[in-house]
Amino acid sequence: MGGRGMNPAKMKQMMKQMGIDVKELKDVKEVIIKTADSNIVIENANVTIMTVQGSETYQIVGDAKEVPKSLEIPADDIKLVMEQTGVSEEEARNALKNSNGDLAEAIVALSSA
């Protein structure tokens, strides 16, 4: 082969003959992969979808960074804990964080304090 690559058009034709369809997903800004502990954010992502025998495979290329998940506590939950226990917003928020968002546990902890 002497270091020469294959003609892209010929490569595409061969893949089509083998039942492989490849297409690029346009205008992708970022891709987020959510795991139990963190999110992997891939910015400036180029996404290619390869379909082989009905199964799709996604190839993602870009600038990846891992972002730890933070516990998001809804304002309604904070308000409910405040109303039930008579504590400040900050105390209610801290109790919910300490209980991993469990309303009952936060209320019991504040009530018994």
Curated annotation (Swiss-Prot):
Gene3D superfamilies: DNA helicase RuvA subunit, C-terminal domain, Nascent polypeptide-associated complex domain
Pfam families for the chain: NAC, UBA_HYPK
Listed SMART domains: NAC (SM01407)
Alphabetical list of PROSITE patterns matching this protein: NAC_AB (PS51151)
GO MF terms, alphabetically ordered: RNA binding
Keywords: Protein transport, RNA-binding, Transport
Domain NAC-A/B: 5-73
Single GO BP term: protein transport
Family listed: Belongs to the NAC-alpha family.
Subunit structure: Homodimer. Interacts with the ribosome. Binds ribosomal RNA.
Function, as annotated: Contacts the emerging nascent chain on the ribosome.
The name this protein goes by in its record: Nascent polypeptide-associated complex protein
The organism of origin for this protein: Methanosarcina acetivorans (strain ATCC 35395 / DSM 2834 / JCM 12185 / C2A)
